[in-house]
Amino acid sequence: PSDGTEYEVVDDRVFQAMCDTKTPQGVLSVIRMPHYTEEEVLNNGKTPLLMVLEDLQDPGNVGTIIRTAEGAGVTGIIMSRGTADIFNPKTIRSTMGSVYRMPFLIVDDAVAFVKRLKERGICTYAAHLHGVHSYREEDYTGGTAFLIGNEGNGLTDDMAEAAQCLIRIPMEGKVESLNAAIASAVLMYEAHGQRE
């Protein structure tokens, strides 16, 4: 190509060995993944709307949250070190390209990070089965961070205690909770709607 991009045509067997999917699309690329600083994620000129993911294990959930976050106007994703790898091929596929546009940060101590958010005036809301208020009762027009926990165990006690407010998504029937990505979408779009 005229833009200087290098490419190479390889044999089908070689291509198959390079891919991690059974039915690859026929194009493979190697790119440098973006890296962000805490300041870049928190101070991008917009009122913060953050997702804090604590120990989510399913790469598909992480990718879906990132994709949905871009659509809902989220300004950054914060992930604990125990969260599924953002560079996992399944995560990247699930983002449908949003991973290249959504600022993210991987932190060693997510609880300490949440405490720093509060110091910056960002209100932290933990999605929690024991939430006192329905998510619809809160104001997300200011700096907001939603805390989402592990698919099987939810948020750790330390993370829930670090939050300023425990919120819940009301459930009908015998369902206790929603999938982490779906719960995240509900919260992100509530904030998006309040900010329109």
Go through each PLM region and give its residues.
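Structured adenosyl-cofactor binding patch, chiefly the S-adenosyl-L-methionine
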Residues: 26, 68-72, 86-99, 157-196
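Short coil/turn connectors at secondary-structure junctions
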Residues: 5, 24-25, 46-48, 73-75, ...
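Active-site/ligand-binding-proximal alpha/beta "capping" segment
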Residues: 125-175
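General small-molecule cofactor/ligand-binding pocket signal
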Residues: 7-10, 105, 167
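Hydrophobic alpha-helical segments and helix pairs
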Residues: 14-56
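RNA substrate-binding interface of SAM-dependent RNA methyltransferases
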Residues: 1-2, 38-131
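N-terminal positively charged helical leader segments and presequences
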Residues: 1-20
